[in-house]
From Swiss-Prot:
Biological process according to GO: defense response to bacterium; defense response to fungus; killing of cells of another organism
Annotated keywords: Antibiotic, Antimicrobial, Fungicide, Secreted
Expression sites (tissue/organ): Expressed by the skin glands.
UniProt-recorded name of the protein: Caerulein precursor fragment B4
Keyword Acyltransferase (UniProt): no
Similarity comment text for this entry: Belongs to the gastrin/cholecystokinin family.
Amino acid sequence: GLLTNVLGFLKKAGKGVLSGLLPL
């Protein structure tokens, strides 16, 4: 559903932000 898509997008966005901030 739409909610699932939004949650998935937020998870991906969160990981992207963390990857950008942390020197991994």
